[in-house]
Every structure is written in structure tokens, then in C-alpha cells.
Amino acid sequence: MKKIFTFLLFSQISYAQEAPRYLFDDLYFADPSAHVFNNKIYLYPSHDIDTEVKDPTNGGHYNMKDYHVLSLDHIGQKKTKDHGTVLKLEDIPWAEKQLWAPDVAEKNGKFYLYFPAKDKEGNFKIGVAVSNKPEGPFTAEKKPIKGSYSIDPAVFKDNGKYYIYFGGLKGGQLEKYRDNEPLAQAKEPNDQENALSPKIALLSQNMLEFAEKPRDIQILDEKGNPLKAGDHDRRFFEGVWIHTYNKKYYLSYSTGDTHKLVYAIGYNPYGPFTYQGEILTPVTGWTTHHSIVEIDHKWYLFYHDSKPSGGKNHLRSLKVRKLEYDEKGFIKTMNGQD
């Protein structure tokens, strides 16, 4: 039997105070995956455009067509560098549309860009593109990862192994699958059933395939019970990220239609993870997608909102702010309207 670890939730919410700042004014970017490579901060975002697709059903207006790489020498740098287009939709043989939130991992001097896109049948798959430099350009593999589905890949290195996390509801199509197999028709669990979970799989040595079948990640309440589908304030929706702090594993994600960024804590990459609280209250705009990174012994939250576009959900701008822990290791909640 797996031992379940539980934590006492906050009796009072403590708030981090440092003001956030925008990172790039010239174009709209979102979903930033931040990493430090060669002592430089690299951002791997999605690239928002004012698309001709106006129907927001299932995220159709998030119609991204390429990826850029951005970089900073340090957090306080006034101008974020745009390395330009590093991968285009037309250069991905299997992909039809919608280059959503990516992530990058480094292994043995090579850089692997993991990205979701819809194939010719309209199903999201996860692809890989490779470069010899963190700033790209990247060359896509001819086919998506076998057995992949849904959106929002995030890759995590732990003890020399690389794990990929993924999944997203609604437009992210996670409801279309059970036990890694497609359903004849998408089916949401009812409110009293267990919520759908983000997925995890060990990556192969060449970083291009799953080394195992994806597994569900359990997210538990304070009593050790899986969060329910009707618990929209806490259950997983999309945008999973993982980091470690003081030998604990912090799984963070968006709650979707309640627009919160929240987290859970566990003791290994597979979990289970016990829900702890909010990292960020709702921002301007529908989506919340982030990364959490340690830089020069300080922790930062990278994320986006839609304030500069006047609240247009599909035109988002990147932000960064300092992330703080209290003395017990809980993350201090931040105000998304700052």
C-alpha cells in the first residue's frame, strides 16, 4: 500500500508582496517555460496572434503558428532578447494547426523542444524538435511521440532521469481518453467522480519516446482522498509544472474555469501529491499557465495575463515576479491583478 503524506493547509493565507513586471512589449507571448542554460535565462513561450479564427469553442482562437525563443542575462534586464522564429508549423510534417504551450529539456548538449499540436484528424499529439543550441532553431521529428495525446508537456529531470508531464481538459482533449486509449466520444466525469489527472511518463534515453505507458498522477485532499471533478477550485485543468524545494516535489497547475494557479506537494516525481493552496489568484484573461524556476538562489514565477491587449483572451503578455516560501515551505499566495 502506498503511504499517503498529508499536510496541514494554511489557517491564514500569506501574500508575497514584490510587484511583477512585463517581459516583452513588441509581440504577444504566453505560457512561458523558463530554464537556465549556460548561465542565461531562456523562455520558451507560445506565440499569440490576432487570428482569423474567431470561434473560441475548444480554444480555436488560440491559433498559434510558430515558436520563438526569448532570453535574459539576468532578471532585472530591461530588454528581453527575441531570438526570432525557431520552429514553424509548416516545418512539422505531421502537424495541422495550433502550436500550444511548449517546454524544453537539455541532455548531453542537445536541446529538445516538446510541443503540442493538432494532427490532420484534429487530435492533439505531442511532438519533439531538436537543436544544438538553447536558442534554436529546432528541427522537428517527422512523427509525434507514439502514444501521446492532449497538451501542455513539461519535462522534469530528477536523479538523471527525464519525465514528461502533460494533459489539459476541454480544448486540451483529455476527456477523450481513458487509460491512454481514445474513447468513441469525449466523456467528462460527473461532479462526484474522481477528477481527471495530469499524466506522467518516463522518457526514453534518446528523449524522443515514452519509455513507459503514461500514468495518472493522484492529487489528494487533506484527508488523502482524490480530488473530485466537481471541485473546480482545486482540481487539475491544465498547465502542469513541477519543481523541487527542500527535498519535496511541488506540482503546480491551473484550475481552468476558476482561473487559479494552485499547487500540491509530494515526495517523488510520480506522486501522490497533496493539495496545499493557491499560488496566484485569477489574472486578467481566461488562462493561467506558468513555470517556477530558481535563479541566483531566488525563486521566480513566470506567467502571463491579458491586460496589455485590453483583456483579449488570445492575446497575452509575459510577466515575471519573485516567488516566496514561508518558514514551513508553503508558497506565499500572489495577487493575479498586480
Task: Indicate residue ranges for each PLM-predicted region.
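Carbohydrate-active catalytic/glycan-binding domains of CAZyme proteins
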Residues: 16-338
